[in-house]
Curated annotation (Swiss-Prot):
It comes from Anas platyrhynchos. The keyword rRNA-binding does not apply. InterPro entries: Globin, Globin-like_sf, Globin/Proto, Hemoglobin_a-typ, Hemoglobin_oxygen_transport, Hemoglobin_pi. One of its GO terms (cellular component) is blood microparticle. This is Hemoglobin subunit alpha-A. Involved in oxygen transport from the lung to the various peripheral tissues. The gene is HBAA.
């Protein structure tokens, strides 16, 4: 998925609004995904999946950090997330569809917290960005 210059600007703009809330939004995204797509819980059998659990917050922080890293290296998302791609493909073996679920839930969280910022154009750009991140994370699957 190729991001245009306008897409990159839109994505960076949204993430500038997210600012210090990235970790909170990461955890909220995971909670939403676990409820909306309960099959995703199978990758976290050892987690306390209750609202506000320390484990969800910690993993949400990792998700947020990866997304921020991708935004900061939007011209080389594959390079920025290479180690994470290896982890998901070779060790964790996460079903690729789960990245689509995560992306959708992240869009919902952004829409809840920043409804005015999520214009149709920004929505499309953020969706393309999340698809690009998902594509990178599944690129090394065999």
């Amino acid at each position: 998925m190729v991001l245009s210059a306008a897409d990159k600007t839109n994505v960076k703009g949204v993430f500038s609004k997210i600012g210090g809330h990235a970790e909170e939004y990461g955890a909220e995204t995971l909670e939403r995904m676990f409820i909306a797509y309960p099959q995703t819980k199978t990758y976290f059998p050892h987690f306390d999946l209750s609202h506000g659990s320390a484990q969800i917050k910690a993993h949400g922080k990792k998700v947020a950090a990866a997304l921020v890293e991708a935004v900061n290296h939007v011209d080389d998302i594959a390079g920025a997330l290479s180690k994470l791609s290896d982890l998901h493909a070779q060790k964790l073996r996460v079903d690729p569809v789960n990245f689509k679920f995560l992306g959708h839930c992240f869009l919902v969280v952004v829409a809840i917290h920043h409804p005015a910022a999520l214009t149709p154009e920004v929505h499309a750009s953020l969706d393309k960005f999340m698809c690009a991140v998902g594509a990178v994370l599944t690129a090394k699957y065999r």
